[in-house]
Amino acid sequence: SLFELGKMILQETGKNPAKSYGAYGCNCGVLGRGKPKEATQRCCYVHKCCYKKLTGCDPKKDRYSYSW
C-alpha cells in the first residue's frame, strides 16, 4: 500500500514522504505524469508502471510485509 511505501521512504531517507515526494517533479504523487527528468522521478515512474501491471489486487490500498 502507499502506507508501506511511505514507511520505506521514511526509513531509508528520513524524509516525510508526503511532504518530500507527494508533488515532486513530473512523476511523483497522485497526478504525476510525463518523462522522468532525474533519478528520483525515474523511481516514481517505475513504481507507477509496476502498479499498473498488477492484477487481482489494489497495490495502493492492500497492506503487505517487508524487510531489508
Curated annotation (Swiss-Prot):
GO terms for molecular function: calcium ion binding; calcium-dependent phospholipase A2 activity; phospholipid binding; toxin activity. PANTHER family: PHOSPHOLIPASE A2 FAMILY MEMBER, PHOSPHOLIPASE A2, MEMBRANE ASSOCIATED. Snake venom phospholipase A2 (PLA2) that lacks enzymatic activity. Is myotoxic, induces edema, and causes systemic effects (renal changes that lead to proteinuria) on mice. A model of myotoxic mechanism has been proposed: an apo Lys49-PLA2 is activated by the entrance of a hydrophobic molecule (e.g. fatty acid) at the hydrophobic channel of the protein leading to a reorientation of a monomer. The lineage of its organism: Eukaryota, Metazoa, Chordata, Craniata, Vertebrata. Its main location: secreted. It is found in: Secreted. InterPro entries: PLipase_A2, PLipase_A2_dom, PLipase_A2_dom_sf, PLipase_A2_His_AS. The keyword Nucleotide-binding does not apply. GO terms for cellular component: extracellular region. This is Basic phospholipase A2 homolog BdipTx-I. Belongs to the phospholipase A2 family. Group II subfamily. K49 sub-subfamily. Keywords: Disulfide bond, Myotoxin, Secreted, Toxin. Expressed by the venom gland. Disulfide bonds join C28-C44. GO terms for biological process: arachidonate secretion; lipid catabolic process; negative regulation of T cell proliferation; phospholipid metabolic process.
